[in-house]
Amino acid sequence: MTKDYLIYGAELSPYSVKVRSYFRYKEIPHQWIIRNQQTQKEFNKLAKIQVIPLVLTPEREVLQDSTPIIQSLEEKFPQNSIIPSEIHTAFISRFFEEYADEWVVKPMFHYRWRYKADQTSASKRFGELFVPGWAKRLPI
């Protein structure tokens, strides 16, 4: 059994990058596994729902959804906590985290798909995850 946590995610997922950033900040041993065509079967066996990020703990526990993942790990790794110790500050921190998760991503998704050049770029990047080489065959 590996001592590393496994993070199934993708660079295009802000929630995956959020979780990976947390692991890096806390210096928690982990492996970054890109969810793609090669890892999909393994992901399907683990996933409760078909979303990333998914974290597999060394104890084989599956965690999904960025905020609950981080909350769970804060209990196991309390050093250098990201949660302020003062209750009012902790509330404000949690408020901004929730706001960012639910609303700050809206403009990101808008600009990912609004303009033709961005649509083309994002489409190619998403397509390469599950059908490698597909963009080379299309006149995009």
Which functions belong to the PLM regions below?
Residues M1-R137:
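GST-like domain detector, emphasizing the conserved glutathione-binding G-site
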Residues I140:
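Alpha-helix-centered segments that form part of catalytic cores
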